[in-house]
């Protein structure tokens, strides 16, 4: 990997797949048509604006999945994948979520609205680090969050307590979810009884990642892909450094 590069997802590159869905820190969404360049080992799949970076990439099983954004100012937006027209790899994407002020997207993925899905949010101070502050954690049913139109602001998904000012982590996916510390030790999460815009409860330890215990959604042919979608991978949000990580590539 190049300096400041990190892996954010895995795809099968199946030509019969609905393709990748990609979300960026500044709220851009892009669906990428499946394409394999046999003459190259890697290639770019989205043109990023200065200061932007990809925070999530997921291979879609079908267009019934909902694309989900979670921002650091506790807004959540989701809508069907069919609301976004696929583009070729040279495209720059379209507005996915309207971020207010200096807010940034900390998580992007895809969720089956028919699943027993949940939303996990962890709040803390504005300058808090995932690995050092426990923060407040909340688990809510995904069904609590109404779908909204693309490029809107979404709905509030977490109420901050005194001393809190941002989400340190956000995640949505199939229930049950599991959390982990920076050493990989599992952390029990509360039951999914949190109100849509309620506050969280003190986390027992700093949570740096959340994932589903379920496998990825079946692929276009009905089989489960060998590579999990981003909704099923441990995810700790955007990088600590908010500078652009360069143009993302498929390898």
Where do the protein language model's features map onto the residues?
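Short, structured "edge-of-domain" segments at secondary-structure transitions
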Residues: 1-251
């Amino acid at each position: 990997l190049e300096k400041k590069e990190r892996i954010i997802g895995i795809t099968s590159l199946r030509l019969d797949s609905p393709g990748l869905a990609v979300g960026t820190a500044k709220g851009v969404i892009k669906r990428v048509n499946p394409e394999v360049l046999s003459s190259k080992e890697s290639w770019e799949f989205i043109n990023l604006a200065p200061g932007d970076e990809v925070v999530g990439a997921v291979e879609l099983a079908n267009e019934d999945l909902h694309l989900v954004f979670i921002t650091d100012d506790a807004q959540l937006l989701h809508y069907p994948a069919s609301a976004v027209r696929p583009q070729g790899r040279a495209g720059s994407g379209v507005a996915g979520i309207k971020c207010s002020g200096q807010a940034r997207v900390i998580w992007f993925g895809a969720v089956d609205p028919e699943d027993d899905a949940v939303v996990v949010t962890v709040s803390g101070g504005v300058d808090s680090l995932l690995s050092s502050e426990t923060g407040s954690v909340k688990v809510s049913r995904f069904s609590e969050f109404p779908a909204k139109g693309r490029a809107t602001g979404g709905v509030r998904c977490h109420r901050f307590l005194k001393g809190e000012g941002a989400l340190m982590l956000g995640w949505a996916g199939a229930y049950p979810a599991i959390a982990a510390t920076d050493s990989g030790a599992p952390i029990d999460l509360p039951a999914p009884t949190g109100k849509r815009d309620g506050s969280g409860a003190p986390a027992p330890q700093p949570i740096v990642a959340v994932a589903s215990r379920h496998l990825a959604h079946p692929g276009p042919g009905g089989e489960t892909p060998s590579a999990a979608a981003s909704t099923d991978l441990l995810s700790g949000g955007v990088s600590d450094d908010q500078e652009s990580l360069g143009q993302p590539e498929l390898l």
